[in-house]
């Protein structure tokens, strides 16, 4: 990846990516694909199925969006980095006020052989150590919602993240799962939203202790 200024040294190489989306039942009503709820109330089932892939040639950021967060070396003591691959697939379904949105993401690393965490042959990278530098693993997110004709909206969501090496203490990606349940009311042509949202999250802390969090929030949102 490239530095942002002349003093910001480049680390690694280029990042490549692409995405494809198909609409087996035709397109959604105008603008309805870009909001969660089926405000336009599709008269027939509309589906978008998508897949994306990216390849970061020499990653030095946990998610491949920056550079220089860590340094690695080859056996000669020169800078060298692993490659980061990310694959995701998703599906969006809308019909008569109902919405289903689900996505899956998998991130892996390659070219890990003969990498070192310091410019010394005594510090060869161990398999689990890479998870302290790169966010590697799998994630699933599923959301469902329904909106009535008079603006009442209901939704639930579940997400799960599983690191490639779940028991590494300083893993860049931590095991967690969460549930959300919400109810909302839209006013003034859907420009004002009043929402009550409940959440339960279970995850592991830095010291690998399980932690549970519960919350209830009320939100007021004005859309322009």
Model-derived features: positions:
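Internal alpha/beta core interface subdomains
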Residues: 4-30
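C-terminal hydrophobic structural anchor segments
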Residues: 145-193
